[in-house]
Amino acid sequence: VLNGPFVLPMFRSFVPRKMQPWIYLFIAVIFQLSGGVYLGALNQMIGSMSLMREDILMCMYANLAGMAIYFPLLFRMKFRFTNKTLLTSAALGVLLCNLIAPHITFLPLLWLVCFIEGMCKIQGTFECMSNIQLWMTPKRDFTVFFPWLHIVILGSIQLSDLITTRLMYHYHWTYMNLFVAGLMLIVLLIQFT
Protein backbone atom coordinates (compact mmCIF):
# COMPACT_ATOMS: atom_id res chain seq x y z
CA VAL A 1 0.00 0.00 0.00
CA LEU A 2 1.31 3.40 -0.93
CA ASN A 3 0.83 5.38 2.31
CA GLY A 4 0.82 2.72 5.01
CA PRO A 5 -2.04 0.39 5.91
CA PHE A 6 -5.47 1.11 4.48
CA VAL A 7 -7.67 2.85 7.03
CA LEU A 8 -11.23 4.15 7.00
CA PRO A 9 -11.38 7.21 9.28
CA MET A 10 -15.11 6.81 9.93
CA PHE A 11 -14.45 3.78 12.15
CA ARG A 12 -13.55 4.12 15.79
CA SER A 13 -10.08 3.16 16.96
CA PHE A 14 -11.12 -0.17 18.51
CA VAL A 15 -12.12 -1.61 15.10
CA PRO A 16 -9.08 -3.45 13.66
CA ARG A 17 -7.80 -1.86 10.44
CA LYS A 18 -7.81 -5.14 8.56
CA MET A 19 -11.51 -5.63 9.39
CA GLN A 20 -12.69 -2.16 8.32
CA PRO A 21 -12.91 -2.71 4.53
CA TRP A 22 -14.44 -6.16 5.05
CA ILE A 23 -17.16 -4.61 7.19
CA TYR A 24 -17.95 -2.18 4.37
CA LEU A 25 -18.00 -5.02 1.84
CA PHE A 26 -20.43 -6.86 4.14
CA ILE A 27 -22.64 -3.76 4.36
CA ALA A 28 -22.62 -3.42 0.55
CA VAL A 29 -23.80 -7.03 0.24
CA ILE A 30 -26.55 -6.35 2.78
CA PHE A 31 -27.76 -3.35 0.79
CA GLN A 32 -27.77 -5.41 -2.40
CA LEU A 33 -29.85 -8.12 -0.70
CA SER A 34 -32.66 -5.63 -0.19
CA GLY A 35 -35.47 -5.19 -2.64
CA GLY A 36 -38.74 -4.19 -1.02
CA VAL A 37 -40.42 -6.89 -3.11
CA TYR A 38 -38.60 -10.18 -3.63
CA LEU A 39 -39.11 -12.09 -6.86
CA GLY A 40 -38.19 -15.37 -5.17
CA ALA A 41 -41.61 -15.15 -3.52
CA LEU A 42 -43.45 -14.01 -6.65
CA ASN A 43 -46.15 -16.71 -6.70
CA GLN A 44 -46.86 -16.42 -2.98
CA MET A 45 -47.18 -12.65 -3.26
CA ILE A 46 -49.56 -13.01 -6.20
CA GLY A 47 -51.74 -15.38 -4.19
CA SER A 48 -51.74 -13.62 -0.84
CA MET A 49 -52.01 -10.03 -2.12
CA SER A 50 -54.37 -10.80 -5.05
CA LEU A 51 -52.05 -9.14 -7.53
CA MET A 52 -51.08 -9.99 -11.07
CA ARG A 53 -47.57 -11.03 -12.04
CA GLU A 54 -47.15 -7.79 -13.96
CA ASP A 55 -47.97 -5.78 -10.82
CA ILE A 56 -45.14 -7.42 -8.90
CA LEU A 57 -42.76 -7.06 -11.84
CA MET A 58 -43.65 -3.37 -11.96
CA CYS A 59 -42.44 -3.16 -8.34
CA MET A 60 -39.10 -4.52 -9.48
CA TYR A 61 -38.99 -2.04 -12.36
CA ALA A 62 -39.79 0.78 -9.93
CA ASN A 63 -36.87 -0.37 -7.77
CA LEU A 64 -34.57 -0.35 -10.80
CA ALA A 65 -35.87 3.06 -11.85
CA GLY A 66 -35.13 4.39 -8.37
CA MET A 67 -31.54 3.22 -8.68
CA ALA A 68 -31.14 4.56 -12.22
CA ILE A 69 -32.71 7.97 -11.63
CA TYR A 70 -30.81 8.56 -8.38
CA PHE A 71 -27.44 7.41 -9.77
CA PRO A 72 -26.40 10.82 -11.23
CA LEU A 73 -26.89 12.40 -7.80
CA LEU A 74 -24.64 9.98 -5.90
CA PHE A 75 -21.42 12.00 -6.20
CA ARG A 76 -23.19 15.22 -5.25
CA MET A 77 -24.54 13.53 -2.14
CA LYS A 78 -21.15 12.03 -1.32
CA PHE A 79 -19.47 15.43 -1.41
CA ARG A 80 -22.30 17.15 0.48
CA PHE A 81 -23.01 14.77 3.39
CA THR A 82 -20.88 12.63 5.68
CA ASN A 83 -20.45 8.91 5.27
CA LYS A 84 -22.36 8.23 8.46
CA THR A 85 -25.28 10.41 7.40
CA LEU A 86 -25.57 8.76 3.98
CA LEU A 87 -25.33 5.19 5.28
CA THR A 88 -27.70 5.86 8.16
CA SER A 89 -30.34 7.46 5.94
CA ALA A 90 -30.00 4.70 3.34
CA ALA A 91 -30.30 1.97 5.99
CA LEU A 92 -33.31 3.67 7.58
CA GLY A 93 -34.95 4.03 4.17
CA VAL A 94 -34.44 0.36 3.29
CA LEU A 95 -35.60 -0.68 6.77
CA LEU A 96 -38.83 1.33 6.60
CA CYS A 97 -39.59 0.29 3.01
CA ASN A 98 -39.12 -3.38 3.89
CA LEU A 99 -41.37 -3.09 6.91
CA ILE A 100 -44.27 -1.40 5.10
CA ALA A 101 -44.07 -2.99 1.61
CA PRO A 102 -45.78 -6.32 2.50
CA HIS A 103 -48.77 -4.47 3.95
CA ILE A 104 -49.48 -2.12 1.04
CA THR A 105 -52.26 -3.15 -1.33
CA PHE A 106 -52.62 0.13 -3.24
CA LEU A 107 -50.34 -0.46 -6.23
CA PRO A 108 -49.12 3.09 -6.99
CA LEU A 109 -48.08 3.45 -3.34
CA LEU A 110 -46.29 0.09 -3.46
CA TRP A 111 -44.47 1.20 -6.61
CA LEU A 112 -43.46 4.44 -4.89
CA VAL A 113 -42.14 2.52 -1.87
CA CYS A 114 -40.12 0.24 -4.18
CA PHE A 115 -38.81 3.30 -6.05
CA ILE A 116 -37.64 4.91 -2.79
CA GLU A 117 -36.14 1.61 -1.67
CA GLY A 118 -34.13 1.47 -4.90
CA MET A 119 -32.77 4.95 -4.24
CA CYS A 120 -31.71 3.96 -0.73
CA LYS A 121 -30.23 0.70 -1.98
CA ILE A 122 -27.97 2.39 -4.54
CA GLN A 123 -26.97 5.08 -2.04
CA GLY A 124 -25.84 2.52 0.53
CA THR A 125 -24.03 0.34 -1.98
CA PHE A 126 -22.29 3.29 -3.63
CA GLU A 127 -21.18 4.74 -0.32
CA CYS A 128 -19.63 1.46 0.79
CA MET A 129 -17.99 0.52 -2.49
CA SER A 130 -16.58 3.98 -3.20
CA ASN A 131 -14.94 4.04 0.23
CA ILE A 132 -13.17 0.71 -0.21
CA GLN A 133 -12.20 1.22 -3.84
CA LEU A 134 -8.61 2.12 -2.93
CA TRP A 135 -8.38 -0.95 -0.71
CA MET A 136 -9.37 -3.17 -3.64
CA THR A 137 -7.04 -1.45 -6.06
CA PRO A 138 -4.63 1.18 -4.66
CA LYS A 139 -3.89 2.42 -8.19
CA ARG A 140 -7.58 2.93 -9.05
CA ASP A 141 -7.48 0.17 -11.63
CA PHE A 142 -11.09 -0.17 -12.73
CA THR A 143 -10.37 -3.54 -14.35
CA VAL A 144 -9.97 -4.80 -10.78
CA PHE A 145 -12.71 -2.75 -9.11
CA PHE A 146 -15.62 -3.43 -11.47
CA PRO A 147 -15.30 -7.24 -11.35
CA TRP A 148 -15.46 -6.99 -7.54
CA LEU A 149 -18.48 -4.72 -7.82
CA HIS A 150 -20.22 -7.11 -10.18
CA ILE A 151 -19.48 -10.05 -7.88
CA VAL A 152 -21.10 -8.16 -5.01
CA ILE A 153 -24.15 -7.14 -7.04
CA LEU A 154 -24.78 -10.36 -8.97
CA GLY A 155 -23.86 -12.58 -6.03
CA SER A 156 -26.28 -10.71 -3.80
CA ILE A 157 -29.07 -11.05 -6.35
CA GLN A 158 -28.62 -14.83 -6.36
CA LEU A 159 -28.27 -14.97 -2.59
CA SER A 160 -31.41 -12.88 -2.13
CA ASP A 161 -33.51 -15.36 -4.10
CA LEU A 162 -32.01 -18.31 -2.21
CA ILE A 163 -32.70 -16.73 1.18
CA THR A 164 -36.21 -15.71 0.11
CA THR A 165 -37.02 -19.23 -1.04
CA ARG A 166 -35.63 -20.78 2.13
CA LEU A 167 -37.49 -18.40 4.45
CA MET A 168 -40.67 -18.78 2.41
CA TYR A 169 -40.45 -22.58 2.56
CA HIS A 170 -40.10 -22.66 6.34
CA TYR A 171 -42.15 -19.60 7.33
CA HIS A 172 -43.90 -17.02 5.13
CA TRP A 173 -42.85 -14.84 2.19
CA THR A 174 -42.91 -11.69 4.37
CA TYR A 175 -40.07 -13.05 6.49
CA MET A 176 -37.57 -11.94 3.86
CA ASN A 177 -38.69 -8.37 4.45
CA LEU A 178 -38.23 -8.88 8.18
CA PHE A 179 -34.84 -10.51 7.61
CA VAL A 180 -33.60 -7.55 5.55
CA ALA A 181 -35.03 -5.13 8.15
CA GLY A 182 -33.01 -7.00 10.78
CA LEU A 183 -29.88 -6.75 8.64
CA MET A 184 -30.46 -3.00 8.31
CA LEU A 185 -30.63 -2.79 12.11
CA ILE A 186 -27.16 -4.39 12.15
CA VAL A 187 -25.95 -1.75 9.67
CA LEU A 188 -27.36 0.98 11.91
CA LEU A 189 -25.69 -0.61 14.93
CA ILE A 190 -22.36 -0.60 13.08
CA GLN A 191 -22.86 3.07 12.21
CA PHE A 192 -23.51 4.09 15.80
CA THR A 193 -20.68 2.13 17.48
Each language-model region and where it sits:
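Cytoplasmic helix-loop-helix junction between adjacent transmembrane helices
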Residues: 115-151
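A generic transmembrane-helix signature of 12-TM secondary carrier transporters
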Residues: 91, 97-98, 113-114, 187-188
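Helix-loop junctions at membrane interfaces in 12-TM secondary transporters
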Residues: 103-113
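Small-residue-rich segments within alpha-helical transmembrane domains of MFS-like 12-TM solute carriers
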Residues: 32, 36, 118-126, 158
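Short hydrophobic/small-residue motifs within alpha-helical transmembrane segments
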Residues: 63-65, 154-155
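Helix-loop-helix hairpin linking two adjacent transmembrane segments in secondary transporters
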Residues: 148-192
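Conserved MFS/SLC helix-loop-helix module at the cytosolic interface between two early adjacent transmembrane helices
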Residues: 69-105
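Extracytoplasmic
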Residues: 20-53, 71-74
